[in-house]
């Protein structure tokens, strides 16, 4: 069983020359693109910075997952990783959880699970902070506007 890379390894983009080689091979094979070539190209897309390129990588991995039972393990991990990088934490968790249900001790998947959990918790806290900030601002504006408009009316309008 091949070892999967850690999620942090996917944060380092390939250099343009490496990307060009894989792109040329993928394009050369055209409609008859081989499974390994498609997988390599999808993998490199996940490591390429522009969002559209990463989305294409996830799409290619999903295609491979559907047609190749022997590549599903790798695809699950990379689909989880790709969705994590795109900020689709629910999908990332779904794919990673499937892999962990089959391989509970998979260190790379456990590492990815930690990263997903950290991002979800961080973004959840940011969401709470934003909502709290809006409520505080609404309260301040409401109190300042009270003489002219009525505090409750202003607070209700700002919070809805």
Swiss-Prot record:
GO cellular component, one term: peroxisomal membrane
Cytoplasmic side: 1-124
Family listed: Belongs to the FIS1 family.
Keywords: Membrane, Mitochondrion, Mitochondrion outer membrane, Repeat, TPR repeat, Transmembrane, Transmembrane helix
Predominant location category: mitochondrion
Record-annotated membrane-spanning stretches: 125-145
CDD domains: Fis1
GO biological process: autophagy of mitochondrion; mitochondrial fission; peroxisome fission
Protein species of origin: Chaetomium globosum (strain ATCC 6205 / CBS 148.51 / DSM 1962 / NBRC 6347 / NRRL 1970)
TPR repeat residue intervals: 73-106
Superkingdom assignment: Eukaryota
InterPro entries per the UniProt record, alphabetical: Fis1, Fis1_cytosol, Fis1_TPR_C, Fis1_TPR_N, TPR-like_helical_dom_sf
Membrane topology: Single-pass membrane protein
Identification of the protein by name: Mitochondrial fission 1 protein
Mitochondrial intermembrane side: 146-160
Free-text function comment from the UniProt entry: Has a role in mitochondrial fission. Has a role in outer membrane fission but not matrix separation.
Subcellular location: Mitochondrion outer membrane
Record comment regarding domains: The C-terminus is required for mitochondrial localization, while the N-terminus is necessary for mitochondrial fission.
